[in-house]
Regions:
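Composition- and surface-driven signal marking solvent-exposed, interaction-prone regions
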Residues: 5, 91-95, 163-171, 189-190, ...
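Long, ordered, helix-rich scaffold segments
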Residues: 37-38, 42, 65, 210-269
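Hydrophobic alpha-helical and helix-loop surface patches within well-folded domains
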Residues: 5-145, 150-151
């Protein structure tokens, strides 16, 4: 399967990971995201939209697309995010033990990851069969009396020429919350720590965090944890704050891009 062989070999491991270790991980990640947002998202929105694993192709050239290669690599990256480094490496070892030298498929790859980690990826498999770019909308609310911060996250994928009906995907949505001094607020619920990668699997979900002692500034979709379009009503103050305080280099860059885009639109209008 080309998405596995090229997405894993050429793009994920060699380009993304090797280039990151050799040079700047942040710069390499930013370049990858630029490719996704500038080119692959456009392909998803075009008459040529197709899933990573097409049901049928007319000729071999149909395999050489940004969706198959670049989006395929992002999907592998999401699996790494969901499983963690140790389980991902176990999955890689099992995958090569089973399929080295054979014509393995996307399903073979995901199955190896599931078997090695004991993590259910059945819902996640939709990334391979559903075309289009998901749009994730985030709304938040803070209650100073209860010190609770609420995120309401919804997802939708616009219809594409090849698929009119869309289903919710399993989206790993990485976040961080910052207090007024730029310190990270630990994520907690019911006295227990909460993973900073939220598992968004439904059309709409609500996440409530306890012991948030200050109106937080959220960093959303940290490291571009999923190839989605993010909708959130940022204020200029929030974006400026993230440019100064976000621990994640990508989040600082992304905040700067969003702020710049806001002022460009104001001047054009």
């Amino acid at each position: 399967d080309r998405s596995v062989s090229r997405g894993l070999g050429d793009v994920y491991k060699r380009q993304q990971e090797f280039s990151s270790d050799l040079g700047s991980r942040a710069v390499n990640r930013i370049n990858n995201v630029r490719t996704m947002r500038g080119l692959q998202f456009a392909e998803d929105a075009s008459p040529m939209a197709h899933p990573i694993r097409p049901d049928m192709v007319i000729e071999m050239n149909n395999f050489y697309t940004l969706t198959v290669y670049e989006k395929g690599a992002e999907v592998i990256r999401m699996i790494h995010t969901l499983l963690g480094e140790e389980n991902f490496q176990k999955g890689m070892q099992l995958y090569f033990e089973r399929h080295d030298g054979s014509a393995a498929t996307c399903d073979d790859f995901v199955q190896a990851m599931e078997d090695a980690s004991n993590v259910d990826l059945s819902h996640f498999r939709r990334w391979y069969s559903q075309s289009g770019t998901p749009v994730v909308t985030v709304k938040d609310d803070y209650n100073p009396e209860t010190e609770q911060y609420t995120l309401t996250i919804s997802q939708r994928t616009p219809a594409t020429p090849d698929q009119a009906e869309k289903q919710p995907l399993h989206i790993p949505f990485a976040i961080e919350l910052y207090d007024n001094e730029g310190k990270v607020i630990p994520l907690q619920k019911g006295g227990h720590p909460v993973n900073s990668v939220l598992n968004v699997t439904q059309a709409e979900q609500t996440f409530v965090f306890d012991n948030v002692y200050f109106q937080p500034v959220p960093a959303l979709l940290c490291e571009f944890s999923a190839p989605v379009k993010l909708e959130y009503k940022w204020s200029d103050q929030q974006l400026t704050f993230l440019m100064r305080h976000a621990r994640n280099d990508f989040s600082r860059w992304d905040a700067a891009q969003s702020l710049l885009a806001t002022y460009i639109k104001l001047n054009v209008a």
